[in-house]
Amino acid sequence: MIKAVLFDLDGTLINTNDLILKSFKHTFKTMLDLEPSEEEITMNYGRPLQEIFKSYDENRIEEMINCYRKINLELHDDECKEFADVDLMLKTLKSKGIKIGVVTSKKSDMAERGAKLMGIFKYFDTFITPEITTKHKPDGEPVLKACENLGVSPSEALMVGDSPYDILAGKNAGAKTCGVKYTALPLEKLGESNPDFYVDKPLEILDLVEKLNS
């Protein structure tokens, strides 16, 4: 029985793919005079910024994070886009008594800003950001915290995401997992984490939950 659906935010509920790509490109060029390929950048989607930048220059992590966040904030409202039918999907889940949470690696201020900009923040019963937990995706702690806040066991939760980090976090917590095929990552990359289920588009989450609860 699925009593709660937990979502990653960027690339799952909100289309921030262009925003993230432009923010990384600007940061790498400005700070390190590097121009990584779009494929190289995309492969990092879903990882915490600190981990990503550490692999490029461990002595300038904070500078790079600050640079990234500055340009991300400047571009944010123009570059955030909706995925089709996300609002309808969330509204329908709520109407069926399903609890809804977000589990994101994005800091709370920008995560909430994006969710409010898209008009979907009102649907969330819990909103887990990196400030709330000691460990982060792919560790299961953020998913466990969301389940605790919602009063459900991990086995009663479905974690939905566009990156292996989302899927592994769900698995490590003992939740069921669902990958979204509209991910910006190569599908085989997402597949390496072996999601229990896949959906082609957000509305299919409704059919999946209904199937699991039948």
Swiss-Prot record:
Gene3D superfamilies to which the protein is assigned, alphabetical: HAD superfamily/HAD-like (3.40.50.1000), Putative phosphatase, domain 2 (1.10.150.240)
UniProt xrefs under InterPro entries: HAD-like_hydrolase_sf (IPR050155), HAD-like_sf (IPR036412), HAD-SF_hydro_IA (IPR006439), HAD_2 (IPR041492), HAD_sf (IPR023214), PGP-like_dom2 (IPR023198), Pyrophosphatase_Ppax (IPR023733)
Residues annotated as catalytic: D8
Gene that encodes it: ppaX
Keywords noted in UniProt: Hydrolase, Magnesium
Cofactor(s) needed for function: Mg(2+)
GO aspect biological process, one term: DNA repair
Reactions accelerated catalytically: diphosphate + H2O = 2 phosphate + H(+)
Chain coiled-coil ranges: none
Enzyme Commission code(s) on record: 3.6.1.1
Family annotation (HAMAP family): Pyrophosphat_PpaX
Record-level Gene Ontology MF annotations: inorganic diphosphate phosphatase activity; magnesium ion binding; phosphoglycolate phosphatase activity
Lineage of the organism: Bacteria, Bacillati, Bacillota, Clostridia, Eubacteriales
Claim: Cell cycle is one of the keywords in the record: no
Similarity field: Belongs to the HAD-like hydrolase superfamily. PpaX family.
Covalent S-S links between cysteines: none
This protein's name: Putative pyrophosphatase PpaX
